[in-house]
Amino acid sequence: LQKKKSVEEKEDVTLSIVETAMAEELKASALYKRISEQLEDKAAKLKFDVMSNAEQKHYERLRKWYEESFGKIPEDKKIKTSKAVKIETPVKSANYEDVIKIIIGTEENACKFYEDAAKKTEDEGAKKLFETLVKMERAHVTQFKDEFRVMTEPSLLFAEEEIPWMLEV
């Protein structure tokens, strides 16, 4: 059982990292929700709703670690939105492809943030948490890069005879 530390006694950069990460996860969740609300395509809306929920779960995981480590929940003012990196918000005229590119960049930034956080923290529990979040964010990057590739490749590789139901009776 990890001994609870006082927030004031914590000398490590971990506290600041977790507070910033919490703010960023909330911001990402809100961005995906906003994008979803603006889309008409149901499959695209669902994808962004799922991403919004995933980012919310990342926030909840961070918050749980914070509560278990310090024995209290962070106050809103403790979440350092002022030092959080600005997420590029797509312009109103952005198409789906533009939005996917922004998301890839955002998720890559999250990977880098958590990789750096894992290197900087001296807290083993936090290090494990950050390494887990790197894997989750990396999965998001892969998912959207694959989708972008499928959208932008001029042709997918398959033979005409592989297409089902392309026959006459």
Language-model regions: role of each:
Residues 1-169:
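Non-heme di-metal
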